[in-house]
Regions:
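Alpha-helix-loop-beta-strand connector modules within alpha/beta enzyme cores
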Residues: 55-79, 117-137
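N-terminal glycine-rich anion-binding loops that anchor highly charged ligand groups
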Residues: 3-11, 30-48, 53-60
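Non-cysteine beta-strand/loop elements that form the S-adenosyl-L-methionine
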Residues: 10-12, 96-104
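Glycine-rich, proline-tolerant flexible connector loops at the mouths of alpha/beta enzymes
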Residues: 43-68, 101-116
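Conserved, mostly hydrophobic/aromatic
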Residues: 17, 37, 90, 98
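Short, well-ordered coil/turn segments that N-cap beta-strands
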Residues: 4-7, 41-43, 71-77, 94-96, ...
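Active-site mouth loops of central-metabolism enzymes
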Residues: 9-31, 75-84, 109-115
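Catalytic cores of alpha/beta
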Residues: 82-94
Length: 137
């Protein structure tokens, strides 16, 4: 179909699906889950969050999960980062894309990342500067 729209699918389950559950999934199970998602044809997966393990123990192994995901041919590996420190760790681990939560409402921003929208926009500028310095293009 020459005029068919392009649809971009970005799977976030390994991050969003795990961050609010109490039980910590093993690293091996996370890697198997990502393998299955990639085998199903997904080409972009948000595999975790680079956040302090004391806040989200489910994400304590995110660098290892990124390392595994990077071995899958053709997979774009994404991770959520709440700030410059998280972005530094994510880039060091080898992610291809970063996502940063900038909320539409002040209340959600404070509940989600304990920062105002203005503070998150400042974080976004810092993350962009870091990305431009370390991984331009």
């Amino acid at each position: 179909m020459p005029n068919a729209p392009q649809v971009h699918i970005s799977e976030v389950g390994p991050r969003d699906g795990l961050q609010s559950v109490q039980t910590v999934m093993s690293t091996a199970d996370k890697c198997r889950w990502i393998d299955a998602l990639a085998a199903a044809g997904l080409r972009e997966i948000e595999v975790g969050s680079f956040v302090p393990a004391r806040l989200l123990p489910q994400m304590a192994d995110v660098a290892e999960v990124v390392g595994h995901a990077r071995t899958l041919p053709g997979l774009c590996v994404m991770a959520l980062v709440p700030n410059r420190r998280g972005a530094q760790a994510a880039l060091a681990a080898g992610v291809h894309k970063l996502t940063l939560p900038v909320s539409a409402s002040e209340a959600h921003s404070l509940a989600n990342v304990r920062k105002t929208r203005g503070q998150m926009l400042a974080e976004l500028r810092e993350v962009i500067a870091l990305r431009n310095a370390e991984a331009p293009g």
